């Protein structure tokens, strides 16, 4: 089940393909080519699988299913490789069956999500595997594609990584700009910054980025 924010992003992605931006050329969702050429009663089957030789970590299978069902709830989708599993080249991740027009309208959006998410998950897994012996956590950041954060951070989880913070609302993180603005950047005043943050948001974790042992000692 996708979150409301994820469902809204799926809807927006479909609208980019199926609804005219000015609502003049198309007043209803429309795949013009399929409407012109494909019998409305035609049935099609399809599948999604990795083409890359090295395979991939699966991420976004549930999103692809949501895309298909958002276009046509009657499309039957079967997930064969769940998110977080590994799929070899040519190994089917999911298969679907339904009205050909519906599948053609949804397939590119479904693939766009899956390609990006599988790539992110696969890269995250490489970092996780490379550092596993030291018990290192691989964290993500907020440097995400606008509107796609929920998917990209989920992909990091599928790859074995760890979400750092979803936004600016769920953790206090004092960076260089905050340090400069706090009491003129006094390196000995970070302890008071931590106290002020804790007083304002007592239930949130606090982190401080430091650039010297002096700043570290003050923050601690």
What are these regions (language model features)?
Residues 1-220:
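Acidic/glycine-rich phosphate/pyrophosphate-binding loops and surrounding catalytic core
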């Amino acid at each position: 089940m996708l979150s409301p924010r994820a469902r809204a992003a799926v809807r927006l992605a479909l609208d980019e393909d199926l609804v005219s931006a000015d609502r003049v050329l198309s007043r209803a969702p429309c795949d013009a080519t399929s409407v012109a050429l494909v019998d409305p009663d035609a049935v099609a089957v399809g599948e999604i699988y990795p083409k890359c030789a090295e395979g991939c970590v699966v991420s976004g299978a549930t999103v692809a299913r949501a895309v298909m069902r958002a276009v046509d709830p009657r499309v039957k989708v079967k997930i064969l490789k769940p998110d977080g599993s590994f799929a070899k080249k040519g190994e089917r991740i999911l298969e679907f069956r339904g009205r050909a027009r519906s599948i053609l309208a949804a397939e590119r959006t479904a693939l766009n999500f899956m390609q990006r998410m599988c790539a992110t998950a696969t890269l995250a897994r490489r970092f996780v595997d490379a550092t596993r012996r030291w018990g290192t956590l691989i964290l993500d950041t907020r440097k995400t594609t606008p509107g796609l954060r929920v998917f990209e951070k989920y992909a990091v989880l599928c790859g074995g990584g760890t979400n750092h913070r979803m936004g600016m609302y769920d953790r206090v993180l004092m960076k260089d700009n905050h340090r400069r603005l706090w009491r003129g950047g006094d390196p000995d005043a970070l302890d008071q910054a931590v106290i002020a943050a804790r007083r304002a948001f007592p239930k949130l974790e606090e982190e401080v980025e430091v650039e010297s042992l002096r700043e570290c000692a003050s923050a601690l």
